[in-house]
Amino acid sequence: MDLWVAIQALILGVVEGITEFLPVSSTGHQIIVADLIGFGGERALAFNIIIQLGAILAVIWEYRRKIIDVVVGLPEERQAQKFTVNLLIAFMPAVVLGVAFADLIHEYLFNPITVAAALVIGGIVMLWAERRDHAIRAETVDDMTWTLALKVGFAQCLALVPGTSRSGSTIIGGLLFGLSRKAATEFSFFLAMPTMVGAAVYSGYKYRDLFQPGDFAVFAIGFVTSFIFAMLAVRALLKFIGNHSYAAFAWYRIGFGLLILATWQLGMIDWSTAIG
């Protein structure tokens, strides 16, 4: 492994870690940055699986106490049982629709116009969700009912559309359905755990032939970097929403969507190859 490859792995690990749990589309950022630094090919596909796994393990580690409490209390504690049921209910819609329509979505929606439109529309909806008057129905994730969990689960299905952002769809959905900012954000984190681990395992098996022993060092750099920066991003986001709305992220989504359209129209990035 030469120095430049190590730097590429470091850069992409940072990008994944920072953007995965922010409502801004980590995939879009990965595509642009990977193109700018010349990181592509089959190695890149396997590498992306590894760094996504690093990011999700970071949030699992960050919430390890909550997870342990739920697991230990599951046999007898009603709150632990309720939380687990809510998580499973929210998890299932994306699994069913993802398995049923994944190939069609990849064939017809993986293009720059879809990605840009999803970013812009998501940003506009996020602004509306933040500015409208609505009653808070759940201050914390423990206050959520199964119906609220199901609604957020259906909102997560929107993330099947490229550019929507998994965290963006669940956070926006949570806000629209009456969750507080903290509850919407934390439930998005918890819902990411089974969703992303499942996706990583599925993709890892599907593309298992792409994992080569010679790439171990590159993968290790990306994994560790993604883990560290995802943990920092999660902590920073929770602190940020304590005193701020999601409006800044909404405007960022809109600007990023327009940037994607510009890079595509001007031929600066070959998006057809990147996401086709």
Swiss-Prot record:
Q: Look up the record and report any one GO term of the cellular component aspect.
A: plasma membrane
Q: Does the keyword Transmembrane helix apply?
A: yes
Q: Where in the cell is it found?
A: Cell inner membrane
Q: Which reaction does it catalyse?
A: di-trans,octa-cis-undecaprenyl diphosphate + H2O = di-trans,octa-cis-undecaprenyl phosphate + phosphate + H(+)
Xref: Pfam families: BacA
Keywords, comma-separated and alphabetical: Antibiotic resistance, Cell inner membrane, Cell membrane, Cell shape, Cell wall biogenesis/degradation, Hydrolase, Membrane, Peptidoglycan synthesis, Transmembrane, Transmembrane helix
Give yes or no: UniProt keyword RNA-binding: no
So where does this one cross the membrane? 44-63, 85-105, 109-129, 183-203, 214-234, 249-269
- UniProt-listed Enzyme Commission number(s): 3.6.1.27
Any one biological process term the GO annotation gives: peptidoglycan biosynthetic process
- InterPro entries linked to this entry: UppP
- GO MF entries: undecaprenyl-diphosphatase activity
Membrane topology listed for this record: Multi-pass membrane protein
Q: Tell me, in one coarse class, where this protein mainly resides.
A: membrane
Per the entry, what this protein does is: Catalyzes the dephosphorylation of undecaprenyl diphosphate (UPP). Confers resistance to bacitracin.
Q: Which family does it belong to?
A: Belongs to the UppP family.
Q: What else is known?
A: Bacitracin is thought to be involved in the inhibition of peptidoglycan synthesis by sequestering undecaprenyl diphosphate, thereby reducing the pool of lipid carrier available.
Protein's name in the database: Undecaprenyl-diphosphatase 1
In its UniProt entry, the species of origin is given as Stutzerimonas stutzeri (strain A1501)
Q: What is the gene called?
A: uppP1
